[in-house]
A protein has these predicted regions:
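Short coil-to-helix segment of the ABC ATPase nucleotide-binding domain corresponding to the Q-loop/switch region
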Residues: 1-10
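Hydrophobic anchor residue at the start of the ABC signature
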Residues: 56
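Conserved catalytic motifs of ABC-family nucleotide-binding domains
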Residues: 63
Length: 138
């Protein structure tokens, strides 16, 4: 198994990043996701929230225009869930489009972002104010 740092390095090498780019970008992303002190650990040595941060870091390390987070808080406690959503918000503020797929209405309602609700494959609401009303089903 690879360490967190090795995982990120592998993701960058896979797309042809130079060693110089890797040396610059990996520490930046580790710091951004709050794992700068845990880069030498293996994912199985980390908590669930930290493992989720590794997944986000791996998605982010090659500086994509967009990341899709499918149920990023699925198995996390409420505090870790909020931390992950705040991290995704920070990533969005830095210029990356973030699409979050979730059933966690209470988490979504804490952020003033666009909310698109889909039911049976159809858009049933598109709210720019970022709030689910009580009638909205997900």
């Amino acid at each position: 198994k690879k360490t967190v740092r090795e995982n990120l390095t592998f993701a960058m090498r896979a797309v042809g990043a130079s060693p110089r780019e890797i040396r610059k970008r990996v520490p930046y992303v580790l710091e951004l996701v709050g794992l700068d002190q845990k880069g030498d650990r293996k994912p199985n040595q980390l908590s669930g929230g930290e493992q989720q941060r590794v997944a986000i870091a791996r998605a982010l390390v090659n500086n994509p225009q967009m990341i899709i987070a499918d149920e990023p808080t699925g198995n996390l406690d409420p505090m870790r869930s909020l931390e992950i959503m705040m991290l995704l918000e920070r990533i969005n503020e830095l210029g990356t489009t973030v699409l979050v797929v979730t059933h966690a209405k209470e988490l979504v309602n804490r952020f003033s972002k666009r909310v698109v609700a889909i039911e049976n494959g159809r858009i049933i609401s598109d709210e720019t104010g970022g709030y689910y009303n009580n009638e909205t089903t997900i």
